[in-house]
C-alpha cells in the first residue's frame, strides 16, 4: 500500500525534471544570495541570483532536499530569467494562493510546473514552494 502511494506521488517525469542539473552548483558570483530551510521537513536550498536592471539574469542553487524541491528549483532556475523583479512577488504569491486550492488552474506562465502543482502532490506544497520562497527572501520583496 505505501509503495503504491509513493509510486503515484513521485513520477518518472518529476525525477527527470529534478535530474536536470544545468543550474546546480554555486559559483560565488551573485548580486543576491540566501539559504533557506523548510522547518517542516528539513529541506534546505541555497540560491545565488544575478540581477541587473530589474531582471533576473541567472539563478544557481544547491539543495539538500527531496525530489520535489529539487524539481521545483530546476524548473525555476530555467524559467526565472523571464521574470521581472517588479512583478515576481505578486506572481509567486498568486501562484501560491491558487495552488492551495486542489482544483486550481495553473497560469500559462507557469505551465511547465504542472507536473509538480497537482492534487497528487498537494501534501508536498511546502517542498515545491521552497525555491520560490527563497527567491522572494533573497530579493527582499
What are the language-model segments listed below?
Residues 2-141:
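Domain-level signature for proteins that mediate thiol-based redox and metal-cofactor handling
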Amino acid at each position: 500500500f505505501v509503495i503504491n502511494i509513493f509510486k503515484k506521488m513521485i513520477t518518472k517525469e518529476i525525477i527527470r525534471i529534478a535530474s536536470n542539473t544545468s543550474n546546480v552548483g554555486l559559483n560565488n558570483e551573485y548580486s543576491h544570495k540566501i539559504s533557506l530551510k523548510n522547518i517542516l521537513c528539513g529541506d534546505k536550498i541555497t540560491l545565488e541570483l544575478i540581477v541587473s536592471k530589474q531582471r533576473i539574469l541567472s539563478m544557481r542553487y544547491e539543495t539538500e532536499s527531496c525530489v520535489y524541491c529539487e524539481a521545483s528549483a530546476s524548473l525555476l532556475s530555467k524559467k526565472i530569467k523571464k521574470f521581472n523583479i517588479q512583478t515576481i512577488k505578486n506572481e509567486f504569491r498568486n501562484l501560491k494562493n491558487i495552488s492551495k486550492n486542489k482544483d486550481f488552474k495553473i497560469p500559462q506562465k507557469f505551465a511547465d510546473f504542472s507536473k509538480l502543482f497537482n492534487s497528487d502532490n498537494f501534501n508536498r506544497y511546502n517542498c515545491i514552494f521552497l525555491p520560490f520562497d527563497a527567491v522572494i527572501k533573497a530579493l527582499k520583496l
